[in-house]
Amino acid sequence: MSKTALVTGSSRGIGKACALKLAELGYDIAVNCNSNLEMAQKAVDEITSLGRKAVAYKANTADIDEVKDMFRSIQQDFGGIDVLVNNAGVVDDAYLLMIKDESLERSLDINIKGYFNCARQASLKMLRKKSGIIINISSVRSVL
């Protein structure tokens, strides 16, 4: 039986690299993007060329309803997940006293609330199976 990993923000960058590596290790991949489904589909194509199953899901991880819908779809398509890689994130390059309120809210929504939303949904499934792995990726920019 194959194992499945959901990698948020996996249409490009570090998330895509993680998704490709997990595919090389034998995982089927749920590719998540916030907006660019075309780019996510390119990641899916690369993963399937490695012989693994992959499906793209467009969902804003900061929106709990979109996250719940994504997890329901993943359950239908893959039968659940074994690994969650919380990678989706944004960086608004500004110092503490210069950051705009909108940028701060966007960063908190995606970088914290989004991770929590996905981890909570994954945990509900993983607890039932009594197994699972959650990996949270951050960066040096998380330091104010």
What is each residue range found by the language model?
Residues 87-92:
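Conserved NAD(P)H cofactor-binding loop of Rossmann-fold oxidoreductase domains
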Residues 135-144:
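Catalytic loop of short-chain dehydrogenase/reductase
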Residues 95-96, 103-108:
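Substrate-binding pocket helix/loop in short-chain dehydrogenase/reductase
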Residues 25-40:
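Conserved glycine-rich Rossmann-like NAD(P)H-binding loop of the short-chain dehydrogenase/reductase
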Residues 119-120:
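A short, exposed helix-loop element centered on a Lys and neighboring polar residues
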Residues 11-13:
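Conserved glycine-rich cofactor-binding loop
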Residues 37, 58-70, 101:
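The beta1-alpha1 cofactor-binding region of Rossmann-like NAD(H)/NADP(H)-dependent oxidoreductases
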